[in-house]
């Protein structure tokens, strides 16, 4: 078991979430095999965080989000030989979006998703490779 990590303070985790230039964010629907890298913007309101992002997903993932809006986002930031991993559990909502550009398949399209985290946990790993702690692989 790899114990070479430190827990991130909440303010550091939020700072990392807001710095989207250095991070890779992955969206997973509860019980879904899909892990989709996404581009996102963060917005703080009333002390809470809300992420709005556009992602290319197929119809099946969109349907899963609409039927069960419990989602997990995992943000990974690699910096100075350390890996910060922030796991956010919360709810997703697909927003109306005029963009219907096809991406990987004809059935795929870009959708705008609003993610509201309910629980945020973060860890910073040292030089050793971290164990796979992705919320996608529960």
Residue map of PLM features:
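Short solvent-exposed loop/turn micro-motifs enriched in small/polar/acidic residues
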Residues: 18-19, 32-34, 85, 106
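A short, compositionally biased
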Residues: 17-21, 67-70
């Amino acid at each position: 078991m790899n114990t070479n990590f430190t827990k991130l303070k909440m303010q550091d985790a939020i700072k990392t979430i807001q710095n989207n230039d250095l991070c890779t964010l992955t969206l997973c629907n509860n019980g879904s095999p899909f892990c989709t890298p996404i581009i996102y913007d963060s917005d703080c309101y009333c002390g809470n965080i809300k992420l709005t992002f556009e992602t290319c997903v197929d119809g099946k993932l969109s349907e899963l989000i609409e039927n069960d809006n419990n989602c997990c986002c995992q943000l990974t930031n690699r910096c100075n030989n350390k890996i910060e991993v922030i796991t956010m559990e919360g709810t997703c909502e697909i927003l109306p979006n005029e963009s219907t550009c096809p991406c990987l398949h004809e059935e795929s399209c870009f959708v705008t998703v609003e993610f509201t985290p309910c629980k945020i946990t973060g860890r910073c790993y040292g030089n050793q490779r971290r164990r796979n702690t992705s919320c996608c692989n529960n």
